[in-house]
Amino acid sequence: MALTGNKGEWSEIYTLLKLLGEGKVYAGDQHMNKIHDLFYPIIMILRQEKEGNFNYKLQDRDVVIQTPEGEELLRIPASVFLVEAENLLKAINENDGAFTVPKIEAFMNRIYCHALKAKSSDKTDIRIILHDLSLIHI
């Protein structure tokens, strides 16, 4: 059955794809404007699915999808995630109400992502482990 979601639900997947593609989270100022030269590299994103938990680990220029035990399931260039994020953003901007995005759903299945959002009892879709560069002392 095809995944159907509204703009907000698809935006959660867009965020996952964009973060994995860029590999970093940018800081913002008090007006929520991106500070381009201040960012935190992403070490890993954790996502809970019905089938279990999956770790999306950034290694070099790849996203490595693993089980919590560290078993590698799939390795994909991070650049592919950026392309898919842009395709999804285009679909989000072109649609209203509830809609499907079959090509993105196919990619989601490939990367062990089978739901648009977390269970209603859990408001956390993803957990991000960051590398805080300010903690490095030379």
What are these regions (language model features)?
Residues 1-134:
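Short, surface-exposed loop/strand segments
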Residues 136-138:
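Conserved small/polar residues in nucleotide/adenosyl-binding loops
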